[in-house]
Amino acid sequence: MCVGARAGGLPNVGSLLRMLCMQYVHDSEGWFSGARRCPSPNFNARPVGVDPELVVVHGISLPPGCYGSGDVEALFCNRLDPSGHPYYAQLDGLRVSAHFFIERSGALTQFISCDDRAWHAGVSQWRWRTDCNDFSIGIELEGVDVHGYENTQYQTLSWLLVGLFCEYPRLSIEAVVGHSDIAPGRKTDPGPAFNWALLRRLLRNKFRPGESGRPLNNSSSNR
Protein backbone atom coordinates (compact mmCIF):
# COMPACT_ATOMS: atom_id res chain seq x y z
CA MET A 1 0.00 0.00 0.00
CA CYS A 2 1.29 3.45 -0.93
CA VAL A 3 1.05 6.20 1.64
CA GLY A 4 1.09 9.98 1.32
CA ALA A 5 -0.39 12.36 -1.18
CA ARG A 6 1.28 13.18 -4.46
CA ALA A 7 2.81 16.63 -4.40
CA GLY A 8 5.02 18.83 -6.50
CA GLY A 9 8.73 19.48 -5.99
CA LEU A 10 9.92 21.41 -3.00
CA PRO A 11 10.47 25.16 -3.30
CA ASN A 12 14.00 26.51 -3.44
CA VAL A 13 13.81 28.96 -0.54
CA GLY A 14 15.62 30.41 2.41
CA SER A 15 17.18 28.56 5.27
CA LEU A 16 18.44 25.08 4.43
CA LEU A 17 18.10 23.60 7.85
CA ARG A 18 14.63 24.96 8.64
CA MET A 19 13.23 23.77 5.33
CA LEU A 20 14.99 20.43 5.63
CA CYS A 21 13.48 19.81 9.06
CA MET A 22 10.00 20.58 7.73
CA GLN A 23 10.21 18.76 4.40
CA TYR A 24 12.64 15.83 4.44
CA VAL A 25 12.82 14.29 7.88
CA HIS A 26 14.64 10.96 7.83
CA ASP A 27 13.12 8.60 10.38
CA SER A 28 14.82 5.83 12.34
CA GLU A 29 13.93 3.27 9.66
CA GLY A 30 15.40 5.13 6.69
CA TRP A 31 12.25 6.74 5.27
CA PHE A 32 11.90 10.42 4.35
CA SER A 33 8.70 12.13 5.46
CA GLY A 34 8.78 14.50 2.47
CA ALA A 35 8.26 11.59 0.08
CA ARG A 36 5.18 9.58 -0.76
CA ARG A 37 5.86 6.08 0.58
CA CYS A 38 5.18 3.07 -1.65
CA PRO A 39 7.09 0.06 -0.30
CA SER A 40 8.53 -2.33 -2.88
CA PRO A 41 9.33 -5.97 -2.10
CA ASN A 42 12.47 -5.77 -4.24
CA PHE A 43 15.24 -5.19 -1.71
CA ASN A 44 17.51 -6.93 0.74
CA ALA A 45 19.80 -5.95 3.59
CA ARG A 46 23.01 -4.06 3.00
CA PRO A 47 26.19 -5.86 4.06
CA VAL A 48 26.82 -5.51 7.78
CA GLY A 49 28.50 -2.23 8.65
CA VAL A 50 27.99 -0.68 5.20
CA ASP A 51 26.32 2.74 4.94
CA PRO A 52 25.50 4.70 1.78
CA GLU A 53 28.58 6.24 0.18
CA LEU A 54 27.30 6.78 -3.36
CA VAL A 55 24.19 8.18 -5.05
CA VAL A 56 23.32 6.86 -8.50
CA VAL A 57 21.06 8.99 -10.72
CA HIS A 58 19.00 7.10 -13.30
CA GLY A 59 16.50 7.98 -15.99
CA ILE A 60 13.42 5.87 -16.71
CA SER A 61 10.06 6.12 -18.46
CA LEU A 62 7.48 3.46 -19.22
CA PRO A 63 6.60 2.98 -21.96
CA PRO A 64 9.90 4.51 -23.18
CA GLY A 65 9.39 8.20 -23.89
CA CYS A 66 5.95 8.30 -22.24
CA TYR A 67 5.37 10.08 -18.95
CA GLY A 68 2.77 9.86 -16.21
CA SER A 69 1.60 6.31 -16.92
CA GLY A 70 2.18 5.01 -13.38
CA ASP A 71 4.00 2.03 -14.86
CA VAL A 72 7.36 2.81 -13.27
CA GLU A 73 5.72 2.37 -9.88
CA ALA A 74 4.04 -0.80 -11.15
CA LEU A 75 7.41 -2.17 -12.27
CA PHE A 76 9.08 -1.49 -8.94
CA CYS A 77 6.17 -3.10 -7.07
CA ASN A 78 5.92 -6.18 -9.35
CA ARG A 79 2.52 -5.11 -10.68
CA LEU A 80 3.44 -4.30 -14.29
CA ASP A 81 1.12 -5.97 -16.80
CA PRO A 82 3.35 -7.50 -19.51
CA SER A 83 0.48 -7.23 -21.99
CA GLY A 84 0.07 -3.50 -21.37
CA HIS A 85 2.58 -2.50 -24.05
CA PRO A 86 4.74 -4.42 -26.56
CA TYR A 87 7.90 -3.24 -24.76
CA TYR A 88 6.77 -4.79 -21.49
CA ALA A 89 7.19 -8.40 -22.64
CA GLN A 90 10.93 -8.11 -22.03
CA LEU A 91 10.29 -6.84 -18.50
CA ASP A 92 8.09 -9.78 -17.49
CA GLY A 93 9.48 -11.30 -14.29
CA LEU A 94 12.09 -8.56 -13.84
CA ARG A 95 12.66 -7.64 -10.21
CA VAL A 96 14.15 -4.17 -9.82
CA SER A 97 13.70 -1.13 -7.63
CA ALA A 98 15.17 2.22 -6.67
CA HIS A 99 15.06 4.04 -3.38
CA PHE A 100 13.40 7.09 -4.95
CA PHE A 101 11.50 8.11 -8.09
CA ILE A 102 11.05 11.74 -9.15
CA GLU A 103 8.23 12.38 -11.62
CA ARG A 104 8.22 15.13 -14.25
CA SER A 105 6.12 17.24 -11.87
CA GLY A 106 8.79 16.94 -9.19
CA ALA A 107 6.64 14.60 -7.08
CA LEU A 108 8.79 12.25 -5.01
CA THR A 109 8.06 8.62 -4.15
CA GLN A 110 10.20 6.41 -1.93
CA PHE A 111 10.10 2.65 -2.53
CA ILE A 112 12.92 1.34 -0.35
CA SER A 113 14.32 2.43 3.00
CA CYS A 114 17.70 4.10 2.60
CA ASP A 115 19.00 1.67 5.18
CA ASP A 116 18.26 -1.23 2.82
CA ARG A 117 19.73 -2.33 -0.49
CA ALA A 118 17.61 -1.50 -3.54
CA TRP A 119 18.13 -3.32 -6.83
CA HIS A 120 18.96 -0.53 -9.26
CA ALA A 121 22.62 -0.62 -10.27
CA GLY A 122 23.09 -4.14 -11.64
CA VAL A 123 26.61 -5.12 -12.68
CA SER A 124 28.54 -2.03 -11.69
CA GLN A 125 31.78 -0.56 -10.39
CA TRP A 126 32.68 2.75 -8.77
CA ARG A 127 36.35 3.45 -8.34
CA TRP A 128 37.73 0.13 -7.10
CA ARG A 129 34.47 -1.27 -5.72
CA THR A 130 31.97 -3.54 -7.45
CA ASP A 131 28.33 -4.34 -6.59
CA CYS A 132 27.33 -0.71 -6.17
CA ASN A 133 23.90 -1.67 -4.82
CA ASP A 134 25.66 -2.59 -1.58
CA PHE A 135 26.70 0.98 -0.77
CA SER A 136 24.56 3.26 -2.91
CA ILE A 137 21.21 5.02 -3.01
CA GLY A 138 19.37 4.87 -6.32
CA ILE A 139 17.29 7.81 -7.55
CA GLU A 140 15.24 7.41 -10.72
CA LEU A 141 14.12 10.49 -12.63
CA GLU A 142 11.23 10.17 -15.05
CA GLY A 143 12.79 10.85 -18.43
CA VAL A 144 14.85 9.58 -21.33
CA ASP A 145 18.47 10.22 -22.25
CA VAL A 146 17.84 12.79 -24.98
CA HIS A 147 14.94 14.79 -23.51
CA GLY A 148 15.70 17.56 -21.04
CA TYR A 149 14.60 16.95 -17.47
CA GLU A 150 12.23 19.39 -15.80
CA ASN A 151 13.32 22.17 -13.46
CA THR A 152 10.94 20.77 -10.84
CA GLN A 153 12.86 17.49 -10.97
CA TYR A 154 16.18 19.23 -10.37
CA GLN A 155 14.67 21.14 -7.46
CA THR A 156 13.33 17.99 -5.81
CA LEU A 157 16.56 16.10 -6.51
CA SER A 158 18.71 18.83 -4.98
CA TRP A 159 16.59 19.01 -1.81
CA LEU A 160 16.60 15.23 -1.51
CA LEU A 161 20.38 15.15 -1.88
CA VAL A 162 20.74 17.77 0.85
CA GLY A 163 18.70 15.55 3.15
CA LEU A 164 20.80 12.52 2.25
CA PHE A 165 24.05 14.42 2.77
CA CYS A 166 22.89 15.42 6.24
CA GLU A 167 22.00 11.85 7.18
CA TYR A 168 24.96 10.03 5.65
CA PRO A 169 28.31 11.75 6.28
CA ARG A 170 30.14 9.79 3.57
CA LEU A 171 27.95 11.25 0.84
CA SER A 172 28.90 14.40 -1.06
CA ILE A 173 28.36 15.90 -4.51
CA GLU A 174 31.53 14.14 -5.68
CA ALA A 175 29.77 10.85 -4.90
CA VAL A 176 26.70 11.64 -7.03
CA VAL A 177 27.07 9.86 -10.37
CA GLY A 178 25.02 8.65 -13.30
CA HIS A 179 24.15 5.03 -13.99
CA SER A 180 26.35 5.34 -17.07
CA ASP A 181 29.33 6.17 -14.85
CA ILE A 182 29.16 2.92 -12.90
CA ALA A 183 28.08 0.71 -15.81
CA PRO A 184 29.78 2.22 -18.88
CA GLY A 185 28.97 0.46 -22.12
CA ARG A 186 25.95 -1.19 -20.53
CA LYS A 187 23.90 1.81 -19.40
CA THR A 188 23.57 5.34 -20.79
CA ASP A 189 21.19 7.04 -18.35
CA PRO A 190 20.49 9.67 -17.20
CA GLY A 191 21.95 10.65 -20.57
CA PRO A 192 23.44 13.76 -22.18
CA ALA A 193 20.28 15.78 -21.51
CA PHE A 194 20.89 15.66 -17.75
CA ASN A 195 22.26 19.02 -16.58
CA TRP A 196 24.97 18.24 -14.05
CA ALA A 197 26.09 21.87 -13.91
CA LEU A 198 22.59 22.96 -12.86
CA LEU A 199 22.46 20.31 -10.15
CA ARG A 200 25.82 21.47 -8.79
CA ARG A 201 24.66 25.07 -8.77
CA LEU A 202 21.46 24.22 -6.91
CA LEU A 203 23.43 22.29 -4.32
CA ARG A 204 25.99 25.06 -3.87
CA ASN A 205 23.13 27.48 -3.25
CA LYS A 206 21.81 25.23 -0.49
CA PHE A 207 25.05 24.09 1.09
CA ARG A 208 27.06 27.18 1.95
CA PRO A 209 30.08 27.35 4.26
CA GLY A 210 28.97 27.95 7.83
CA GLU A 211 25.48 26.60 7.16
CA SER A 212 26.25 22.90 6.78
CA GLY A 213 29.89 22.71 7.84
CA ARG A 214 30.52 20.76 4.64
CA PRO A 215 30.85 23.24 1.75
CA LEU A 216 30.73 21.75 -1.72
CA ASN A 217 33.56 21.72 -4.21
CA ASN A 218 33.27 24.89 -6.29
CA SER A 219 34.62 23.24 -9.42
CA SER A 220 33.32 24.69 -12.69
CA SER A 221 33.18 21.21 -14.22
CA ASN A 222 29.97 20.09 -15.91
CA ARG A 223 30.05 16.96 -13.73
Task: Give, region by region, the residue ranges found by the protein language model.
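Generic low-complexity segments that are intrinsically disordered, proline-rich and/or Lys/Arg-biased
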Residues: N12, S40-N42, P64, G191, ...
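Conserved, mostly hydrophobic/aromatic
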Residues: I139
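Short, low-complexity intrinsically disordered segments enriched in A/P/G/S/L with frequent Arg
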Residues: G8-L10, G14-S15, R214
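N-terminal catalytic cores of peptidoglycan-degrading enzymes
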Residues: L16-T130
